[in-house]
């Protein structure tokens, strides 16, 4: 792996800092604390540049909250950084480092990265199952236990050192990585391990969580060869192959690799025959010839459709959330559900109009501020 250097100056460059502030402000320009920064953006860009150049940046405490995430409603602990200076620093770092971190990432390593969402994993699985039925007789499925909260700082920093030779960039990553257990205090979770964990919900984390498993992705794919398929969505891994013996060896390979970082596989890992049951992954159920949605998700979606359809005024949050969930149905073989519970019940046109009107209001507010 060729190490990358001489990049820190690009991060604290005034123009990059100014663009980072604007990136961080997207979707929240009407907030008072954001308005204050945008009204004097040139001054704040200079201040941001100076604190990065002079190494005076110190992360602020996070706001910790729990959410039910995505269509699967998985309970997650989010650590939200302050807009100023933390989110602006994160964007300044990511604007320069994103293309560098993207290099070497396995093609079907998806999740948390723009352009590499669940759709890429879904299409990859469907394509392989349909085109290569003989090579997809068996399936290996697993995920990592509490991945984000268990990421070891020492191994993550060592991996970054193998990728980056600029000591100042490594310093900034170190500040962000070390800040999480110290500043994301949550009474519900208890004291955090000071040597482990990165926060869900901040921009650098989405790259770091994928970057740490980059070697594992290539190691598995090399072991499986061309006659198998592999995809990883953040910490969930699915692999297919013509025989289960080799997939059991993949489990051993993954366990050994993760064990070096004191990470563990969840106990519900499995190797099974595709003809006996579908692949339950990303909220979908993948069969050899079709893709459906998990029943629990359809039940929640049914309730949501009924609730929103009865509203006199639909909020932006409800409109965007429901449009996203309806997209799941569109991307699956769920014709019966569409006909019975969506068609003539909820208007996508109405939902899109809510989103469009809100965006017009936001653009008008931005023009007035300018």
Feature map (PLM): residue ranges:
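Non-catalytic, polymerase-adjacent accessory regions of viral genome-replication enzymes
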Residues: 1-46, 362, 366-370
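Active-site-proximal segment of RNA-dependent polymerases
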Residues: 3-8, 94-152
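Amphipathic alpha-helical blocks
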Residues: 37-61
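Conserved polymerase palm-domain catalytic core
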Residues: 51, 128-234, 238-255, 273
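Short Gly/Ser/Thr- and Asp/Glu-enriched loop/turn motifs at secondary-structure junctions
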Residues: 60-62, 231-235, 268
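Conserved pre-motif C helix in the palm subdomain of viral-like polymerases
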Residues: 74-106, 194-222
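Right-hand nucleic-acid polymerase module
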Residues: 87, 91, 186-195, 248-255, ...
């Amino acid at each position: 792996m060729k190490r990358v250097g001489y990049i820190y100056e690009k991060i604290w460059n005034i123009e990059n800092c100014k663009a980072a502030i604007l990136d961080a402000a997207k979707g929240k320009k009407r907030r008072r604390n954001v308005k204050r920064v945008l009204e004097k953006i040139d001054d704040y860009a200079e201040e941001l540049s100076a604190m990065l150049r002079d190494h005076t940046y110190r992360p602020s405490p996070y706001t910790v909250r729990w959410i039910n995430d995505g269509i699967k409603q998985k309970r997650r602990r989010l650590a939200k950084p302050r807009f100023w200076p933390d989110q602006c620093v994160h964007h300044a770092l990511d604007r320069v480092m994103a293309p560098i971190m993207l290099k070497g990432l396995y093609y079907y390593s998806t999740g948390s990265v723009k352009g590499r969402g669940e759709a890429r994993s879904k299409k990859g699985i469907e394509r392989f199952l349909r085109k290569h039925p003989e090579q997809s007789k068996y399936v290996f499925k697993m995920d990592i236990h509490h991945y984000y909260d268990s990421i070891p700082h020492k191994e993550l920093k060592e991996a970054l050192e193998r990728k980056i030779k600029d000591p100042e960039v490594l310093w900034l990553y170190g500040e962000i990585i070390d800040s999480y257990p110290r500043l994301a205090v949550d009474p519900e979770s208890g004291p955090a391990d000071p040597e482990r964990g990165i926060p869900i919900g901040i921009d650098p984390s989405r790259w770091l969580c994928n970057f740490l498993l980059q070697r594992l992705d290539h190691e598995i794919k090399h072991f499986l060869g061309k006659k198998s398929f592999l995809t990883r969505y953040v910490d969930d891994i699915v692999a297919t192959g013509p025989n289960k013996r080799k997939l059991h060896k993949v489990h051993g390979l993954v366990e050994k690799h993760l064990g070096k970082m004191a990470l563990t596989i969840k106990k519900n890992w499995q190797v099974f025959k595709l003809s006996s049951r579908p692949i339950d992954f990303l909220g979908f159920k993948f069969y050899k010839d079709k893709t459906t949605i998990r029943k629990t998700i359809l039940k929640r979606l049914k309730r949501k459709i009924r609730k929103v359809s009865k509203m006199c005024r639909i909020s932006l949050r409800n409109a965007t959330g429901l449009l996203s969930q309806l997209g799941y149905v569109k991307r699956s073989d769920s014709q019966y559900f569409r006909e019975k519970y969506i068609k003539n019940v909820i208007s996508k046109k109405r939902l899109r109009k809510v989103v469009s009107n809100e965006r017009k209001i936001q653009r008008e507010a931005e023009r007035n501020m300018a």
